[in-house]
């Protein structure tokens, strides 16, 4: 952003008084790094710490941020404020030092709320679909020439980054319910894609508590704000009478304000019609597969229509949509002759989905777009608590693929829970008689096990939220050939 653009932005968004140096503890996460990137481009001095370098820390370093790959008290001593990731514990030496030095320590969402305070905020919440919907809204606003600021939990492929500082009054952000920190946000528009039982430790295992928290989030909207909600979701439909704000609904349901109809999928593209009240029909070509992505697009269109964005810009943005990182991310198609001597090819797709509903949506999109391909899934369960709480749902959904290779649970810092491990889940799936899953206890053996499982005209889904994304990239780099991958 040049000096003239920054001056224009400052007329909308004033500087934070007494804040020059902002330190992030856990800066390598997509959400933390995205906020740091926006603030760096606003001219603040940025530093941060994490345990290992990654693409996020590399990008921030190129913007002039000072990144430490250790947690030490001295890292924070010159900071005006310290922003902390939800993954960081209170005994972290940087947090202790900041408190001792009377430096304010705030959560990530509090800083995001500050970025949103003087802007027209659009916050996207929900159990599933937040990241993709955030990217779709961003793409439409960018196509319309509105140059929004955005902060997303995943890579926006068209922009090549998780976040970007725009020159307009618009801020589009993913809102995280996992630790209830989205209650800090006070947007003008809020999307809720769906509500399911997830992150239940945050809500004391009480689903009513989770539902009320979403209501409280929506009541952070001003009385003239807009709630955009998916009426196909049974929980959302139940909650509608309790939302005391203007509501626009969307979905496949007949009573949706923005209604998806005539959906069909050809390869990776969805084709459908959007019906809007008192507006022309939109005939949409969406460059993203699956009925779930048609719903995400409908939410984005509802917001854009309310803002008065031209229909042509909306349609162009959806047809050109490049997606987000690790959301049905096509990595390549490789001949099997060099992999295992078989004829035919195998497509490789990487996907972040780690909840049964998300995995089911990904499987359905794969089946609809490539009905003649055999579906081979490499799945890494994420968290023992989630595996325990949704055990039967996982067993049902994972039984729908043709071949299943399952890695050990990615713990995300949790202690093992008896009966909520990958071996138990494989045993349960095998007992249901549809498929015989392969338990992969040593990740180094996966390329060879995968090569033995491929038969030609396969679609490989690498599925999960842990470190499995790195494995997907290794498989792509090796073109699925086990001798190179090892």
Swiss-Prot record:
GO biological process: cell division; cell wall organization; peptidoglycan biosynthetic process; regulation of cell shape
UniProt enzyme class: ligase
Gene3D superfamilies assigned: Mur ligase, C-terminal domain, Mur-like, catalytic domain, NAD(P)-binding Rossmann-like Domain
EC number(s) from the headed UniProt entry: 6.3.2.8
Main localization of the protein described in the UniProt heading: cytoplasm
Catalytic reaction equation(s): UDP-N-acetyl-alpha-D-muramate + L-alanine + ATP = UDP-N-acetyl-alpha-D-muramoyl-L-alanine + ADP + phosphate + H(+)
Pathway, per record: Cell wall biogenesis; peptidoglycan biosynthesis
Keywords, sorted A to Z: ATP-binding, Cell cycle, Cell division, Cell shape, Cell wall biogenesis/degradation, Cytoplasm, Ligase, Nucleotide-binding, Peptidoglycan synthesis
Record's protein name: UDP-N-acetylmuramate--L-alanine ligase
Lineage of the species this protein comes from: Bacteria, Pseudomonadati, Pseudomonadota, Gammaproteobacteria, Enterobacterales
Gene: murC
């Amino acid at each position: 952003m040049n000096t003239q653009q920054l001056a224009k932005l400052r007329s909308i968004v004033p500087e934070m008084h007494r804040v020059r140096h902002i330190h992030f503890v856990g800066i390598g996460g997509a959400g933390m790094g995205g906020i740091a990137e926006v603030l760096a481009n606003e001219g603040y001095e940025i530093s941060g710490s994490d345990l290992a370098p990654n693409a996020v820390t590399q990008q921030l370093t190129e913007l002039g941020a000072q990144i430490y790959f250790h947690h030490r008290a001295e890292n924070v001593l010159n900071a005006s404020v310290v922003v902390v990731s939800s993954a960081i514990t209170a005994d972290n030496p940087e947090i202790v030092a900041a408190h001792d030095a009377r430096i304010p320590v705030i959560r990530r969402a509090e800083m995001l709320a500050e970025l949103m305070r003087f802007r027209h905020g659009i916050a996207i919440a929900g159990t599933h679909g937040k990241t993709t919907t955030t990217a779709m809204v961003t793409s439409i606003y960018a196509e319309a020439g509105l140059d929004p600021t955005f902060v997303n939990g995943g890579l926006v492929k068209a922009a090549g980054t998780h976040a970007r500082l725009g020159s307009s009054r618009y801020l589009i952000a993913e809102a995280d319910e996992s630790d209830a920190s989205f209650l800090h946000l006070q947007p003008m528009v809020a999307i809720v894609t769906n509500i399911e039982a997830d992150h239940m430790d945050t809500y004391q295992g009480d689903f009513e508590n989770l539902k009320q928290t979403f209501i409280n989030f929506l009541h952070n909207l001003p009385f003239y704000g807009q709630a955009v909600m998916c009426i196909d979701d049974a929980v959302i439909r139940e909650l509608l009478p309790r939302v005391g704000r203007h509501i626009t609904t969307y979905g496949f349901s007949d009573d949706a304000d923005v209604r998806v109809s005539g959906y069909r999928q050809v390869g990776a593209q969805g084709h459908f019609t959007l019906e809007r009240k008192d507006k022309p029909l939109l005939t949409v070509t969406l460059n993203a597969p699956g009925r779930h992505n048609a719903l995400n697009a409908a939410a984005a269109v509802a917001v854009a229509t309310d803002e008065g964005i031209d229909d042509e810009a909306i349609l162009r943005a959806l047809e050109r949509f490049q997606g987000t990182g690790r959301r049905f991310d096509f990595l390549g198609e490789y001949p099997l002759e060099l992999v295992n001597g078989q004829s035919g090819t195998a497509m490789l797709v990487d996907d972040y989905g780690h909840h049964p509903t998300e995995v089911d949506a990904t499987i359905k999109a794969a089946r609809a777009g490539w009905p003649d391909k055999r579906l081979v899934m490499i799945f890494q369960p994420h968290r023992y608590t989630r595996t325990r709480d949704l055990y039967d749902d996982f067993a049902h959904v994972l039984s729908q693929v043709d071949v299943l290779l399952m890695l050990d649970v990615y713990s995300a810092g949790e202690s093992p829970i008896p009966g909520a491990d990958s071996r138990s889940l494989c045993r349960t799936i095998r007992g249901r008689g549809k498929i015989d899953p392969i338990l992969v206890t040593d990740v180094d053996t996966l390329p060879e096990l995968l090569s033995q499982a491929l038969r030609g005209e396969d679609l490989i889904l690498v599925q999960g939220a842990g470190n499995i994304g790195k494995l997907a990239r290794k498989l792509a780099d090796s073109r699925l050939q086990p001798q190179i991958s090892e």
